[in-house]
Amino acid sequence: MYANAQPLSPLRFIERSAEVFPQREAIVYGDQSWTYQAFERDVRRFATALLPHLPPLSVSGDDAAASGDAAGQGYLGAEQLTRSLPTVAVIAPNLPAMLMAHYAVPAAGAVLVPLNPRLSTRELDYILEHSEARVVIADSSVLDSVAAAIEGKDGITLVQLPDEQAGIEPVREHSHGEKIPTFDEFIDVEPREAGRAASSGERGVSYGVTDENSPITLNYTSGTTGRPKGVLYGHRGAYLNSLGEVFHNGFDGATRYLWTLPMFHCNGWCTTWAVTAAGGTHVCLRAVRPDAIWDAFDNQGITHLCGAPAVCSIIVDADEAHALDNPIRITTAGAPPAPSIIERLESAGFGIVHVYGLTEVFGPITICEPQEEWKELSPQDRAQQMSRQGVGMVQAESARIVDTEMNDVPKDGEALGEVVLRGNNVMIGYYKDPEATEQAFFGGWFHTGDLGVMHPNGYIQLRDRAKDIIISGGENISSIEVEQALYSHPDVIDVAVIGVAHEKWGERPVAHVVRSAGSSVTGEELREHVRERLSGFKVPDTVTFSDELPRTATGKVRKNLLRG
């Protein structure tokens, strides 16, 4: 350690907030609450309970030095990708225990694997095998599926997480007749004091690290087109990305953040650590239900939330919806909300910010920074500006749009290229897949596979995923562009456009649409609506209506299912 160089880790945030704001409310879940002092105490109990179930530490100063040697390959931490890591999987919704795991697991010297409780047994089997999880903590509602996934795997400690608030009782025995301890039973230990950093061969509870580029979490991609990839995040990236979230969201001690975004998705965009850094309050929410969201708005003084555009629709379409007494900031990612949704949210008192990112970059890495002059625009024109993915966040480098030779495309809003990214919040790499990592980091930049344009003001705008571009008669059709044209119709609340094989043109666009309640708009009317806005060859050949679109837990449309 040096006086002027301290390894960075977001674990420091809970230590600091517990010291500075011991009696401030840190977590609320139903009728339960934790002060920062109690939050930190339970984190240490959790970490202490994990210690006997983890292997001896293998990280040494030599490993820390080796992570720097990989810089010649265009990225740090190459050696982390192939060695076995001590991992702890937590399969749960947005409960206090999932939040605590973001501190307790790395404080015990392990790597957190946060997982979606809606994953199938087959998916869990693959991820738990790939990650080599030593401890698995699972919501009691999915215990049978989890127990089936770990069957035949040796050396795994299984812990269940009942939820009294939701009426989910503990399962006393699983199918093999074994008693599974509850989370409260598991952490019922005398907490160890937290040291600064454990030395080689010793395992203890520590809020410090010797190597800031060592892994803190292992997040799995949604795997919509194949096996999910394991994305390794480092302590340094998590620390800096968290502070970027604090800055861009304006988090402070008065922040009351509602957990509508899954914590298992990119560690909740690092908000698991960011709100704690600011000394704000985490308001946990088990399920994204309109009544629960509006109850939190009315009774918990919510100031911020994040989520997919689908969450925005849930909020404004709720029976409980009404004008807010105090403004609430919504940060949304993915496809921008429809102009009609933006107008309804703003009129109710919500402020909306659009961000862009991927699992590989800790969640958001660019932000569509609002400009003062946009306030004078019509809702339609303002929505058009807000639909852009914007500029790099403060903790990241500027995003680039490049051609196949890695040259920047013209800033004309027309020239199409790939979005490439660089910065402190880019992953260490894909766990156990150095070849895919090398490909992703070609030329010293992370290649997103997203296609976009660069506007004259430096704001990027996505046109499509490379695999979702529809090539019709040799012309590129952006599915996003067609979706946005359909979204501009007031009766369209959700839409996905895909390419289908065509004997003459190669591919043609087809639209899958969810209409607003009571709407009788026809497919031909929607096709005419698109024709008024886009070139004729971009108009979908057919429009199919359904009650809902298949989505991942993080709100992405599963276009692979629509393609069949």
Task: Specify the residue positions occupied by each region the protein language model found.
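Conserved pre-ATP/AMP-binding loop-to-beta segment of ANL
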Residues: P22-Q23, Q160, K179-Y220, R227, ...
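AMP-binding/adenylate-forming catalytic core of the ANL superfamily
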Residues: L119, V136-A138, L305, G423, ...
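Conserved AMP-binding/adenylation subdomain of ANL enzymes
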Residues: Y239-R256, F264-H304, A318-D319
